[in-house]
């Protein structure tokens, strides 16, 4: 269920604590990438999913602790994890409500996943792209994503980019210190 009101802060704190405990329990089974992912980014992902309440969540990149936060944001959402293109199975006609694209060491993979998912984006879709300033290739890819005809408002959080697809708003690119 979606968290609202001033009591949301307490609810979020409780959920963050529970997710951190679950993450620590699973850590021995995972690689170092699982442990060192940014807490701030994981919490942002949780809040975005919780606010948007997407029916479909796509997590494209190496399996990481962020998967716990994405799933917890909306329980019951159709969650798809793909660390390579062959794992990206999406039902025909089903829109992608939320995409977390975080394999910035492989810009070709990110571009292909974006191409597949942008065709399935709807007005409520939100895509979060990690590593937008990691390399010159990623900077160029981020610029192309911002200029895509489907994309409306974008937020550049320096290492993270957020794309909104609501075309009722005027297309605008914001740079925000995060």
Q: What spans do the regions from the language model cover?
A:
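Single conserved hydrophobic/aromatic residue that forms the stacking wall/gate
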Residues: 1-8, 12
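A conditional alpha-helix N-cap/helix-loop micro-motif detector
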Residues: 38-39, 106-110
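SAM cofactor-binding core of SAM-dependent methyltransferases
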Residues: 32-94
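Short SAM/SAH-binding signature in class I
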Residues: 94-101
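Short, surface-exposed connector motifs at secondary-structure boundaries
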Residues: 52-54, 96, 122-127
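C-terminal substrate-binding/active-site "lid" region of AdoMet-derived donor-dependent transferases
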Residues: 109-178
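A glycine-rich, hydrophobic loop/mini-helix early in the fold
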Residues: 16, 22-37
């Amino acid at each position: 269920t979606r968290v609202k009101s001033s009591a949301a802060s307490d609810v979020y704190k409780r959920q963050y604590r529970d997710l951190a405990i679950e993450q620590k329990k699973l850590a021995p089974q995972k690689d170092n990438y699982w442990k060192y992912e940014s807490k701030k980014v994981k919490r942002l992902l949780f809040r975005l999913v919780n606010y948007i309440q997407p029916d479909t969540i796509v997590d494209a990149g190496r399996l990481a602790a962020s998967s716990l936060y994405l799933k917890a944001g909306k329980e019951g959402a159709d969650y798809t994890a793909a660390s390579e293109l062959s794992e990206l199975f999406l039902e025909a006609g089903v829109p992608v409500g939320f995409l977390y694209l975080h394999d910035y060491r492989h810009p070709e993979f990110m571009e292909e996943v974006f191409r597949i998912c942008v065709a399935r984006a709807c007005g409520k879709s939100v895509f979060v792209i990690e590593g937008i300033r990691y390399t010159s290739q990623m900077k160029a890819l981020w610029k192309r994503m911002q200029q895509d005809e489907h994309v409306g408002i974008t937020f550049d959080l320096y290492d993270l980019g957020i794309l909104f697809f609501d075309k009722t708003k005027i297309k605008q690119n914001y740079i925000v210190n995060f």
